[in-house]
């Protein structure tokens, strides 16, 4: 148990003995992109010291123990607060946790009265039962929250492994997925789409590369699609909270997949002694003056798409000189 938090709860008169304490496990994630809430202090039941001190945007606590079966008033104060007298009362939230339950709590929304459009009020999004590890060995479990105040209703498809299958049905701001996605711990590509399937943006989710096998994660849509209408705040992205807490991990924008290819010229026909090789009718040869019994090094070519390989004489001036072509796909 966090010693500081234990002291705060004792001071608040909430505990008489540790052994008698009913408790729940809670992870708190700061996803309010309002500049006024960039760093906050979090108080519980007006304790003399913040339970979470200097809590920064796009960070998370680890899973911590909190009292269950009693009302907890969560107070938010500026990050430079000196005590519970600095709590902004309009942001107070009261929760009552269930003994033995595990929760994910995400702070979302706007604190400022102006400068943001739209401006849904600051609130806590609560999900239970949370997970601290994957439910199946070898998997990664992912809970997803739509936490971008100005983003529309979207869905999420996986395009690298599942062939574009929709893994998150259309959901709107402030809504969690109904449960964790249970997926193999492999590198995925998550494509955010409008509900009609129109792609918006895609992100790599390198679960294997990052060693996230057996982990349970929380992914949040975070920031603003239109920063200019939101006090030039942080731009939209997908960020992931680890069960150990700390700074959220930003998912990188997806890159077009490539394959490594070596090409060897072994056509002994004198007419093909030296050729130029064009790909998809490009203006310049991808392989220039390619001679019999030579080879390219391994090169990157687009993967998963149709490639038209055009062969032209070695003195070609452009794709109009292609004399034969073949279609292929590399993965």
Per-region residue spans from a language model:
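Bacterial N-terminal signal peptides that target proteins for export
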Residues: 1-7
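Domain-scale selection of a single, long terminal region
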Residues: 8-10, 15
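N-terminal signal peptide c-region/cleavage motif recognized by signal peptidases
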Residues: 17-19
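Intrinsically disordered, low-complexity polar regions and short flexible loop motifs
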Residues: 21-331
